[in-house]
Amino acid sequence: MGLAGPRKRTKISHDPNNTAWSRSTSGYGHKIMSAQGWTPGSFLGASNAAHADHFTAGSAGHIRVILKDDNLGLGAKLRAEDEPTGLDAFQGLLGRLNGKSDEELEKELKKRHDRQLANFVEKRWKTMQFVSGGLLVHEKIQALADVKSAGGEEVQTPQISHDELKSEKRPKKARKKEKRRARGDDTGLDLAEQSPKRKRKDRKENKEKKKSSDDSSYANQGTPSEDALVDKIQKKRKKRKQKDPEPSNTEVHDDSLPPDTRSVSQEEQESRYSAKNESIRKIREHRPMGRQFTRGRHIQQKKLALMDSKSISEIFMVKC
């Protein structure tokens, strides 16, 4: 028994580089891809596609896998082990020996500095890298050419007056309104523009105008029977207006009445007003139905029991 650790017997496989699957032509993937027009060494996708110019030699190659040789997590990179230090100064020295100017050396140094900063940010905070999936539409930018005639004379553009430009800018509705006004059809306005209140007012006014025109036509006629009918209609309207006056919240005070009678009349009015309000409240009471009704009764009983001291003592079994 020595101090040596346990021996690990490793067996080298027949395919250490793992390239047998890419060379085999008997697999299902190779067969179906070759049936669809793929050949070994060519990249995937149509060769006449709009984004075919962006393909490189790497597009035809396989996906490379780096073997993990450290205890870091997946996707981690060795930071400072493989990076040489002092290489920037050495490259600058070689550039001066080759006869490069100071401006060129400063530009190269700035590029390297920016690249180092980008690498540091990517390692520290992880940036997103976008891969282009191809061009959707193959656009061609055409240069604008001056429109000239065959003889070299410039084509004269028709001059448009200021009024015509204004008329073009105006909306169609405004033009239609102006045309109607010119014709004299002011009554034919768009009903869609009018609000519903305006529509109701217009209807009422039209009805009143019709009634007044009918009354005037009846009055203009000379027969005594028709005049009597018109008088009756007008009297009926006056009576209706007197019977149904508008409700007013303001109190009416009669200066002619004495103070005693005035106070009595005010008390009678207030009593009538309160009675009316009570009747309205009774009518407007919400009466729940079904489950809500039973729940409401139980809640009322609980409230009454809590308000009564005897019932509380009975609930908690306390002797008074």
Curated annotation (Swiss-Prot):
Classification via InterPro entries: G_patch_dom, PINX1
Annotated segments matching region Disordered: 1-24, 152-298
G-patch domain: residues covered: 25-79
Biased composition (Basic and acidic residues): 203-214, 243-256, 269-288
Bias-annotated ranges (Basic residues): 1-11, 169-182
Residue stretches of biased makeup (Polar residues): 15-24
Domain of life, source organism: Eukaryota
Pfam families: G-patch
Subcellular location per the Swiss-Prot or TrEMBL entry: Nucleus, Nucleolus
GO molecular function, one term: nucleic acid binding
GO cellular component: nucleolus
GO process terms (BP): rRNA processing
Entry keywords, A to Z: Nucleus, Ribosome biogenesis, rRNA processing
Its biological purpose: Involved in rRNA-processing at A0, A1 and A2 sites and negatively regulates telomerase.
Family: Belongs to the PINX1 family.
Protein name (record): Protein PXR1
Species this chain originates from: Ajellomyces capsulatus (strain NAm1 / WU24) (Darling's disease fungus)
Lineage, broadest ranks: Eukaryota, Fungi, Dikarya, Ascomycota, Pezizomycotina
